[in-house]
Design a protein with these regions (language model features):
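Conserved C-terminal helix/tail region of periplasmic/extracytoplasmic solute-binding proteins
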Residues: 31-34, 38, 66-67, 166, ...
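Extracytoplasmic "Venus flytrap"/periplasmic binding protein-like
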Residues: 54-131, 167-174, 263, 267-271, ...
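Extracytoplasmic/periplasmic solute-binding protein
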Residues: 139-151, 156, 180-226, 269
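Short, polar/charged alpha-helical segment
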Residues: 28-30, 46-66, 401, 419
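Glycine-centered hinge/linker elements that transmit conformational signals in sensory
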Residues: 183-185, 224-253, 297
Length: 433
């Protein structure tokens, strides 16, 4: 296992909210205290939740709690959550959340239950809260309150067909600006395959596009204003949109992780820039095990600044079963469960899972797994959680970013016009903060 990844995970000091947890672990802990209770988990139908839900029966046997799982695609999950929360409904007890996206917004709306008291007073002896990545705990802390527990760490990585690269006599470029030339050579060499695919769906694409922006030296805001029309911003929009327009699949404006992974897994794409979470999905069935390589996106004029975030599991502030819900969070994020999920390709937020000999042996079984771990190591050391604008209205900001990229991708507007319109709308959002 890569020592740098471990160092990043353990090397940062923890917030004081974690320091209280060892006192609580000495107390008697009863997993059956809320037996007979029924809780509802609103889940994103992604690899993290899918891997976790496979073990649902283990949680129910341990606690006697009935777990109802409502799983949706990410956009539909959030629509369901917003409807429930706006109605102050108690129908959702636990939900998945991305602090980098909605943390500030949901916290200010009062939708998260504060988990700080639970972490201080209601943890099992073997929970070990200090085992979590400090950076992920920091991301899940808003105004001094813990809004969720980390489930994973992830970021976009480049999956690519080593066998096709060898056949076509190409290699990954050292500079991001040379990606179109690579895609063009692949298109000429293998005209029946899609050279490059990544996210085109408006609310989803900032996750992958942000790496292009940051690697080319751009940022979303400068001096309190939107900076999408900076020279680096314009260049990054042109590059990202151009790759998908000229070398992506038909209908790519509707692509998110599901369509991308399906296309690559089926052997119809040579390169796929998508979440590290998708490793297990892509490798499922074994067709890609022998021909896939994994790497971070090439650096650009601004260096290498990959996206690095993590999903959390949160308790609804309107739940009538917060104590039972906390048991589910604790079980899902426990050292034992995280070690199991790591063996299914879910990068763990706990150092104990990273150090586990079983995980090391699992990674060593395939070259792609070793490369995946190396890529996560680099994401950990150099990554940023800035996906969209660092404002309460982050989710809305992503729509405007996506619209600007889509306009260029579809040929509706040149990059300069698309980003100018986006900057105007984004500055209006910023002014409301």
């Amino acid at each position: 296992m890569h020592s740098a990844l471990r160092a990043v995970v353990v090397g940062i000091s923890f917030a004081t909210l974690l320091s209280a947890s060892p006192r609580a672990t000495a107390q008697a802990f009863d997993w059956h205290k809320y037996a007979g209770t029924r809780i509802t988990f609103l889940a994103n139908n992604n690899p993290v939740a899918n891997a976790l839900v496979k073990h649902k029966d283990e949680f129910e046997k341990l606690t006697g709690i009935e777990l109802k799982v409502d799983a949706y695609q990410e956009q539909q999950m959030r629509q369901r959550l917003v409807t429930s929360m706006n109605a102050r409904s108690s129908e959702v007890d636990v939900f998945m959340s991305l602090p980098s996206r909605e943390g500030l917004q949901f916290a200010r709306a009062g939708w998260y239950a504060d988990l700080t008291p639970y972490l201080a007073n209601a943890v099992a002896p073997d929970y070990d809260a200090k085992d979590f990545s400090p950076g992920l705990v920091k991301d899940a802390t808003v105004d001094g309150k813990l809004i969720g527990v980390p489930l994973n760490l992830e970021g976009p990585v480049l999956y690519y067909r080593g066998d096709i690269f060898k056949k076509c006599g190409v290699a990954l470029p050292a500079d991001l600006k040379d990606m179109p030339a690579l895609a063009d050579r692949l298109k000429k060499c293998e005209p029946d395959l899609t050279p490059f695919v990544s996210r085109g769906q408006k609310p989803a694409l900032p996750f992958t596009y942000s790496v292009f922006l940051h690697n080319m030296g751009g940022s979303y805001m400068q001096d309190g204003k939107s900076a999408l029309c900076s020279p680096a911003g314009v260049a990054s929009i042109r590059l990202y949109a151009g790759l998908l327009k000229d070398y992506g699949p038909p209908g790519v404006v509707n692509y998110s992780f599901y369509q991308i992974s399906s296309l690559y897994k089926a052997g119809r794409a040579v390169m796929a820039f998508e979440s590290s979470n998708e490793l297990s999905t892509i490798m499922q069935g074994g067709a890609r095990e022998g021909d896939t390589n994994v790497a971070v996106l090439p650096a650009g004029a601004g260096g290498s600044h990959p996206t690095m975030i993590g999903w959390t599991m949160a308790v609804s502030n309107y739940s009538r079963h917060k104590d039972a819900a906390w048991l589910f969070l604790q079980w899902a994020s426990s050292p034992a469960m995280q070690k199991k999920l790591a063996l299914e390709g879910i990068a763990p937020p706990r150092v104990s899972a990273l150090r586990d000999p079983a995980f090391t042996a699992w990674a060593d079984q395939q070259p792609a797994r070793r490369q995946w771990v190396a890529a996560l190591d680099q994401l950990s050391r150099t990554g940023t959680a800035e996906v969209g604008y660092p404002i309460v209205a982050n989710p809305a900001s992503r729509e405007f970013i996506g619209q600007a990229v889509n306009d260029v991708m579809l040929g509706s507007r040149p990059a300069e016009q698309a980003c100018t319109q986006a900057d105007q709308s984004l500055n209006d959002l910023i002014a409301k903060e």
